[in-house]
Amino acid sequence: MRPATKIYGLIGRAVDYSYSPLIHNTAFEQLSLPCRYTIFNITEEHLVADALKGARALGLAGFSVTIPYKKTVVPLLDSLSEEAKSIQAVNTIVNHEGTLVGHNTDIAGFASPLLPHARSIQGRPVAILGSGGASLAAIEAFRTLFMPSEITLFMRNPAKETRMTDPAIKRCALGDLRESGSESSALLRDAAVVINATPVGTLGRPDAHMSPVPAESNLLHQGQIIYDMVYNPLDTPLLLAARKAGAVTIPGMEMLLAQGAAAFRLWTNLEMPMDAVRSALLNEIGASAI
């Protein structure tokens, strides 16, 4: 008798572009697991509670959660992991026989490709571009694993930003990077690591050809690590400019794979077959760029 198929899925809004089904279904197939991963587009925030209630009733095995619902699901779950509590955001849900537990694998996923550089980051300043949910995971990872001397957050309008109120984090305006003599420019130039946590440079967006760091600014240089969370295309305008300047570059695909592997482990207690998944993802991203 065949075991029933376990259903996993991605909760989000207008997320048909996601590579998560490819990642997880490739892993399930490689390990011959009776599991399937699909997409659940939820059009309105108030419907998320109904979706989770239905998941309990139907016995859906687990979920990934993406924008704009990473914080929406928090009060709707039965418990949270320590990582999810620390930033009050969930990107992975495990259904334990009707008990929904929220986790956050973005923190570990973000940290994974930076770990080989940990010693060179400790005690030095870092910069994060963007103030959305992705930046929260980066901040928590830096604080708990890398101990930089200072974290500077570059945002569109620091005066109106209400989410990032921690006095230990320096806040600057992204627009000031266009002024060569500004404090913002100096802070970015001095940063050991620069993280792009904005969607600028993503394939298909109006700003796909742009970098969040102005190309003419000469702020990127040898000795820096430039990490772009954007995973499609592999070589974003920011990474191309950073490589030209002699910096070490980390593409967003590394975070995508690492956080996906952590979620897979939570759901199955197994390690994701990374070589097969990476190959499938590279083929898909390469095809989408043609």
From Swiss-Prot:
**Record-level GO cellular component terms:** cytosol
Q: In which pathway does it act?
A: Metabolic intermediate biosynthesis; chorismate biosynthesis; chorismate from D-erythrose 4-phosphate and phosphoenolpyruvate: step 4/7
Query: Which EC number applies?
Result: 1.1.1.25
Binding-site residues for NADP(+), renumbered to this chain: E82, G130, S131, G132, G133, A134, M229, G252
Q: Which Pfam families match?
A: SDH_C, Shikimate_dh_N
**Keyword presence, Oxidoreductase:** yes
InterPro entries membership: Aminoacid_DH-like_N_sf (IPR046346), NAD(P)-bd_dom_sf (IPR036291), SDH_C (IPR041121), Shikimate_DH (IPR011342), Shikimate_DH-bd_N (IPR013708), Shikimate_DH_fam (IPR022893)
Which chemical reaction does it catalyze? shikimate + NADP(+) = 3-dehydroshikimate + NADPH + H(+)
Q: What GO MF terms are annotated?
A: NADP binding; shikimate 3-dehydrogenase (NADP+) activity
Keyword check for Cytoplasm, yes or no.
no
Active site at which residues?
K70
Q: Which UniProt keywords apply?
A: Amino-acid biosynthesis, Aromatic amino acid biosynthesis, NADP, Oxidoreductase
Its biological purpose is as follows: Involved in the biosynthesis of the chorismate, which leads to the biosynthesis of aromatic amino acids. Catalyzes the reversible NADPH linked reduction of 3-dehydroshikimate (DHSA) to yield shikimate (SA).
Q: Protein name, please? A: Shikimate dehydrogenase (NADP(+))
Give the originating organism.
Chlorobium phaeovibrioides (strain DSM 265 / 1930) (Prosthecochloris vibrioformis (strain DSM 265))
